[in-house]
Amino acid sequence: MGNPTMWFEVAGKDFPGLKGFYSQLFGWELTDMGEMPYATVDAKNGGIPGGIGQAPEGHPGHVTFYVQVDDIEAALSKAESLGGKRAMGPMDIPNGQIALFADPEGHEIGLMKMNQ
């Protein structure tokens, strides 16, 4: 098997509204990340963990998934060589780094490298 999918993310203009919607729709337990408008989805009972957050100002929001990689820069460069475009990052997060790229049709996909 290749690199595993390890995280999903839903970001939009109305963080509290999205949080309530997904919590009520799927019965998800959400944990707020302090002052940052982001909540993690509990995956104790199986499934892929993820998060729901506020999209940056001027960004319409997105739904994406993150794939684990060993080298974010190498993965971004490979995506670009195959017709993709760098969309964000790399950016440091607690315990690692993330980045986004757009595939040749414009779909944004995330990359995640966790610290050992």
Provide a role label for each language-model segment.
Residues M6, V10, L76-S77, L82-Q116:
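Vicinal oxygen chelate
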Residues M1-K19, G46-G47, V63-F65, K113-Q116:
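N-terminal beta-strand motif that seeds the catalytic metal site of vicinal oxygen chelate
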Residues Y22:
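Catalytic core of tubulin tyrosine ligase-like
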Residues D14, P37, I72:
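A generic "binding-loop/recognition-motif" signal
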Residues G27-G61, E108-K113:
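Conserved short beta-strand elements that form part of the metal-binding/catalytic scaffold
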Residues H59-A87:
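Mid-chain, well-packed structural core segment of small domains
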Residues T40, Y66, I98-L100:
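Conserved hydrophobic/aromatic beta-strand scaffold that supports enzyme active sites
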